[in-house]
Amino acid sequence: MVRDKASGALVPADMETFKAYMPELFAGEIQVDIEAFTPLIDSSDIGPQIWEQVARMVVSHYDEYDGFVVLHGTDTMSYSASALSFMLENLSKPVVFTGSQLPVGVLRSDAKENLLTAIEIAAAKDEDGNAIVPEVTIYFEDRL
C-alpha cells in the first residue's frame, strides 16, 4: 500500500512503485522475480478464489525457484497462509507470507525489514542444500 497523493487514501502499490521504494531488493545476492496479480487486491477482499490463484502460481513455478514470498495485507494474511498450508502439502520449499503495519512509503515502515527477511528465509538452505523452512509460514514483526 502507498498513500495516494491526490486523496491521501491508502491504495495498493503497483510493482514499479514498490520497486522504487525498495531498490535494495535487486542489489543483493538473491535473485528476486516479481509476479503480481492484476488488478491488485486489498487483503480484506481476499478469499478462496485468490487462495487458489496463489497456490496455482506457486505450483506452476515450483521447479524454477528455491522459495516463494507472498506480499499480503495484514487483514487476512493468517487466513490466506493457513489455507495455502492445506493446499500446498508436503512442500520441500518455503512459501513465506509477509506484509507490514505501515505502508512502504512511510518513514518508519516495517515493510522493508519484513520483506527482506522473508526473502532471506525463502532462500535459506542447510549444508545439504535443503530448504531450512520447507513449509508455508508467516514472517512478521521479527517473528517466523
Where are these regions (language model features)?
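Active-site histidine-anchored catalytic micro-motif
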Residues: 1-144
